[in-house]
Regions:
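N-terminal secretory signal peptides and thylakoid transit peptides that target proteins
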Residues: 1-16, 23-29
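Ligand-binding clefts/hinges and TM-proximal coupling segments of bilobed small-molecule sensing domains
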Residues: 32, 163-180, 217-220, 250-283
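Extended ligand-binding regions for polar small-molecule ligands
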Residues: 32, 73-82, 147, 162, ...
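Extracytoplasmic small-molecule ligand-binding "clamshell" domains
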Residues: 32-112, 120
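Periplasmic-binding protein-like
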Residues: 53, 130-137, 202, 206, ...
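Short helix-initiation/N-cap motifs at beta->coil->alpha
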Residues: 89-99, 178-188, 192, 228
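A ligand-binding cleft/hinge motif common to bilobed small-molecule-binding domains
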Residues: 95-96, 112-121, 167-170, 196-226
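Flexible hinge/capping segments at coil-to-helix
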Residues: 137-155
Length: 283
């Protein structure tokens, strides 16, 4: 079973704070340039991308050189090449990148789940990849299924308002769910013994384990196998050429296994080797 059929429709909690009404969204869009994104990138030769500090392996910033690396950075460069353009990065957050798209500050945002709440205010490309879900547990605890977590004596850390929380409440509701503000707090809760495990998507979980040797292994949970599309966010426009281009770009590079290469290379920058990636995971 896929969470995209069962649970995404109820994802009112979302993963970001978006505008409170469509009227606000419309005002933000009205302030953006009337020039289409496709024409703007083609003519200016600049692709403006939301860069997310601390969100490795999508984005890694070298403090000394201010250079950006990571899987999303390589994807952005490849997209820009099609327009003979350079990439310009605007530091942002997941939540602010939605607002930045609406106001026309950026042309593209990476690594967004297309929740119904977000889709009220921005558009999305077709999936860049499907992002599976699992858990990082304390050492000695190795659950295999959601049922292994769905017990009153299991303490499950989740970041409040995230799809991680949504999955936990749908499939492990009998567990003691501990809501915390950030993913880092959730990981710390497992390290310090406050929680038995934390729910994380594959990319985030694998990276967390490499950063924190005191944690147990990352495990993709089964029954059900939960996964969500990971997409690129764009501004809603009458001219559909930009989103059409990104759809074709995603389909082509996913089919050619180039997305997989960028993913593996980005994970390697954070110490995650191909052999660390669970066999159930496919990019």
């Amino acid at each position: 079973m896929d969470i995209s059929r069962r649970a995404v429709g109820t994802a009112a909690i979302g993963t970001v704070v978006v505008t409170s009404s469509l009227a606000v969204a419309e005002r933000a869009n009205a302030q953006a340039s009337t020039e289409s994104t496709f024409d703007r990138v083609k003519q200016s030769k600049v692709l403006r991308v939301a860069a997310l500090p601390g969100e490795s392996p999508y984005f890694n910033k070298n403090i000394a050189t201010s250079e950006w690396t990571g899987m999303a950075v390589e994807m952005a460069k490849n997209i820009a090449t099609s327009f003979d353009a350079k990439v310009e990065y605007l530091e942002s957050t997941y939540g602010n990148s939605v607002l930045d798209l609406q106001s026309g500050k950026i042309d593209l945002a990476f690594a967004l789940n297309p929740t119904p709440q977000r889709a009220l205010v921005i558009g999305f490309s077709r999936p860049v990849f499907m992002h599976g879900f699992g858990t990082v547990a304390k050492k000695g605890f190795e659950p295999k299924t959601w049922g292994d977590l769905n017990k009153p004596d299991i303490r499950i850390a989740v970041d409040i308002g995230s799809v991680h929380e949504l999955a936990a409440r749908n499939f492990a509701s009998k567990g003691e769910i501990i809501g915390l503000k950030t993913r880092d707090e959730c990981v710390l809760a497992v390290q310090t013994g406050r929680a038995d495990c934390v729910i994380l998507a594959v990319i985030l979980g694998l990276t967390a384990v490499k950063k924190n040797p005191a944690l147990g292994k990352y495990i993709v949970l089964r029954d059900p196998f939960v996964q969500l599309p990971n997409c690129m966010g764009v501004r809603y426009e009458v001219d559909k050429r930009w989103r059409d281009f990104l759809d074709n770009w995603a389909d082509y590079n996913r089919g050619a296994a180039q997305i997989r290469k960028w993913m593996i290379d980005g994970l390697a920058l954070n110490g995650v080797m191909p052999e660390d990636i669970p066999s159930q995971v496919g990019f």
